Amino acid sequence: MSITAQSVYRDTGNFFRNQFMTILLVSLLCAFITVVLGHVFSPSDAQLAQLNDGVPVSGSSGLFDLVQNMSPEQQQILLQASAASTFSGLIGNAILAGGVILIIQLVSAGQRVSALRAIGASAPILPKLFILIFLTTLLVQIGIMLVVVPGLIMAILLALAPVMLVQDKMGIFASMRSSMRLTWANMRLVAPAVLSWLLAKTLLLLFASSFAALTPEIGAVLANTLSNLISAILLIYLFRLYMLIRQ
């Protein structure tokens, strides 16, 4: 059977509309978890204020020079802030991926589904999803730091890994290998969706500061919710595409 991107886009749109409230609640809950965890593990406001003390920003030629000009205490605060942001984001993304994929599975099985039920049902696979998303993010970031293009290619090749891990109960590395092989064979169907997702996330990041007009916390939750909705659409597309490819 010939698979067209247009038909998968149409199926994705229909599912997203029909399950919008459930997906929205999952996205909102994951955004709230991300923001709360980030706040809990981040340095205090007083510690963050120390990052500006005695650091000659205008005289620094780059990020590495800026970090080198910091005191050991400031470097530790920066490391803690970065680790808190990364950890909270990975937790939120893992719960989002598990929740959205479980929504699709439950709806496909004809069962009633709620946001809490989907997240609860995904609990057993969350540790594996967390590790998978961590490894995927690490590989993509390394690729982007090198020449950008390798990072984009890795993001595309590993896109199906979360779906395979949950749907077929694969191991972490097995799902990554299988995703690379299957995506390479169906690049024309996967690449445009992943690149559109990356573009949408980048545009959202550019306008994220405008959400802080309310309060920083509410703005962060709103921005993360929109980001999660964008990721949910991609997950629905990839799940539907994977089911069609397997037929």
Curated annotation (Swiss-Prot):
It is found in: Cell inner membrane. The keyword Transferase does not apply. InterPro entries: UPF0259 (IPR009627). Its main location: membrane. GO terms for cellular component: plasma membrane. It is a multi-pass membrane protein. The keyword Protein biosynthesis does not apply. The chain crosses the membrane at residues 20-40, 87-107, 118-140, 153-173, 187-209, 225-245. Disulfide bonds: none annotated. Belongs to the UPF0259 family. This is UPF0259 membrane protein YciC. The gene is yciC.
